[in-house]
Amino acid sequence: MARTLYEKLFDAHVVYEASNETPLLYIDRHLVHEVTSPQAFDGLRAHNRQVRQPGKTFATMDHNVSTQTKDINASGEMARIQMQELIKNCNAFGVELYDLNHPFQGIVHVMGPEQGITLPGMTIVCGDSHTATHGAFGALAFGIGTSEVEHVLATQTLKQGRAKTMKIEVKGHAAPGITAKDIVLAIIGKTGSAGGTGHVVEFCGDAIRALSMEGRMTLCNMAIEMGAKAGLVAPDDITFNYVKGRLHAPKGNDFDDAVEYWKTLQTDEGATFDTVVTLQAEEIAPQVTWGTNPGQVISVNDNVPDPASFADPVERASAEKALAYMGLKPGIPLTEVAIDKVFIGSCTNSRIEDLRAAAEIAKGRKVAPGVQALVVPGSGPVKAQAEAEGLDKIFIEAGFEWRLPGCSMCLAMNNDRLNPGERCASTSNRNFEGRQGRGGRTHLVSPAMAAAAAVTGHFADIRVLK
C-alpha cells in the first residue's frame, strides 16, 4: 500500500499499539530548554527515576537569556532560577547542556540541526511549539507539554495518535528576492491560521525543492502557525550535503548507509492525502502581516484590507479587532506604515542565510532616525560565522545592534521587548496580541524586508528599494 512520508515515519517508530489504544512511539531525540523542563525533572526526582537515554537528550538555554551579556542574572529572578535549575538538572541526570558560556549555545531549533543532532527519519520532540522546524530534514518533529517532557525523559517514548495528512505543493519558481518566509506566509494566508489543524503537512513542489535547508527550516517552523501538528520536507541531496560532517551525524560508511535509507523517505507514488493545497510560486510577492495572527497577511504593495470585505462574519469581526489593536486604518498602503523597532532573529529566521540577506539590504545604508533595530544570531556558531564574513560590521556601521544568541524579542520572556503601542517589523513567527510585549504591534516579514523597514523607517518593497 502506498504511504505518505508522514505515515512511513510514524509506522517506523511504533513501539506498541493495542486495539483501540493510542500508539506508543519511540523518540529518537529529545531537545530541552530552561522554560518547560524544571517541573519535568522534578517529576523524575519525585518518583526516583533516571533519564532513560541521556545520550539522546540535549539541552540549551535560549528563551530567557539576555542578548547583551552572558550574565545569568541579567533577565530577572525567574529567568535566573530557570537557568540555574537547568544547570543543576543536567548535571544530576547526565544530560549534555550547552549553557551560556558554551560555543554551541543558541536557540534550540537552530542548535539541533547545526550540530547534526537532527537527522532525517527521526522522531524529535521538545517542550516548544516550533519543534516542527526539524521536519525540514524529513524528521517527524513536534512540540510537547511539560508532562510529556517528563514522560520522554523517563521512557524515551510518547503516546501519539495518528494525524491527518496535508500536501502543500508550491509549483513553479519564486521570483528573485522572494524567500521561504514569504512562501510560508502566503501559504498561511491561503489556509488561514487554523487550516492545518489536526494535520501533518508535507511541503513539496519545485519551489520547495529549490530552497536551502535554512529556507526549509523557516517553512516547517511555521507549519504550527497554520494549526498543523508538524511540517515535513522529504530529504534529498541538499539535506544530505547539509548534514554531512556535522558533529553528531554518522561518519564514513555509516553515513553512506544512512543516506541509502534516507533516500527511501519519500511519499510513494499513488499515496493519498486528506487535504491538498496548491500555490503558484510566481504569484508570491514579499509578504507582511497586518493583523494579529499569521493568516492576516498581504503583499507589501497591497493596502490594509477593509473588514467589510470579508464575507465570513467571524473573519470580519476578527479583522475589526485586529485593526483596532494594530492601530491601522483600512485602505492605507502598507508602505506608508511607519515602524519603531526591527527584530531580525528567532528560530524562524536567525541562521546565516537570513543574516546574509538582511546584511545585503543594510550594506551602505543607515537605520532610519527613531528606529531601534536588533540583529540576534540564532547560535554561537551562527554568530561566529557572521563575524568571520564581516556581517556584524555591516550591521553595526548601518546602526543596527549586534547581539548575543537567544530567542530575544520573539517573545516577551527576556529584556528584549516592545513597549505599549510600539510597532515592530519582525522576522519571528507569531504576531498575537502582546507576543513581543504588552501592547506591542508585530508585523511578520522576511529578514530582507525587516532590514528594508529598518533603513526606510516604514515597510518597503525590496524589489524596488533604491
From Swiss-Prot:
Source organism of the structure: Enterobacter sp. (strain 638)
Needed cofactors: [4Fe-4S] cluster
InterPro entries: 3-IsopropMal_deHydase_lsu, Acnase/IPM_dHydase_lsu_aba_1/3, Acoase/IPM_deHydtase_lsu_aba, Aconitase_4Fe-4S_BS, Aconitase_4Fe-4S_dom, IPM_dehydratase_rel_enz, IPMI_cat
Cofactor note: Binds 1 [4Fe-4S] cluster per subunit.
Gene Ontology terms describing biological process: L-leucine biosynthetic process
UniProt binding sites for [4Fe-4S] cluster: 347, 407, 410
Family recorded in the similarity comment: Belongs to the aconitase/IPM isomerase family. LeuC type 1 subfamily.
Listed name of the protein: 3-isopropylmalate dehydratase large subunit
Keywords: 4Fe-4S, Amino-acid biosynthesis, Branched-chain amino acid biosynthesis, Iron, Iron-sulfur, Leucine biosynthesis, Lyase, Metal-binding
Reactions that this protein is recorded to catalyse: (2R,3S)-3-isopropylmalate = (2S)-2-isopropylmalate
Task performed by this protein: Catalyzes the isomerization between 2-isopropylmalate and 3-isopropylmalate, via the formation of 2-isopropylmaleate.
Pathway in which the depicted protein is active: Amino-acid biosynthesis; L-leucine biosynthesis; L-leucine from 3-methyl-2-oxobutanoate: step 2/4
PANTHER family: 3-ISOPROPYLMALATE DEHYDRATASE (PTHR43822:SF9), HOMOACONITASE, MITOCHONDRIAL-RELATED (PTHR43822)
SUPFAM superfamilies linked: Aconitase iron-sulfur domain (SSF53732)
EC number: 4.2.1.33
Subunit structure, interactors included: Heterodimer of LeuC and LeuD.
GO molecular function: 3-isopropylmalate dehydratase activity; 4 iron, 4 sulfur cluster binding; metal ion binding
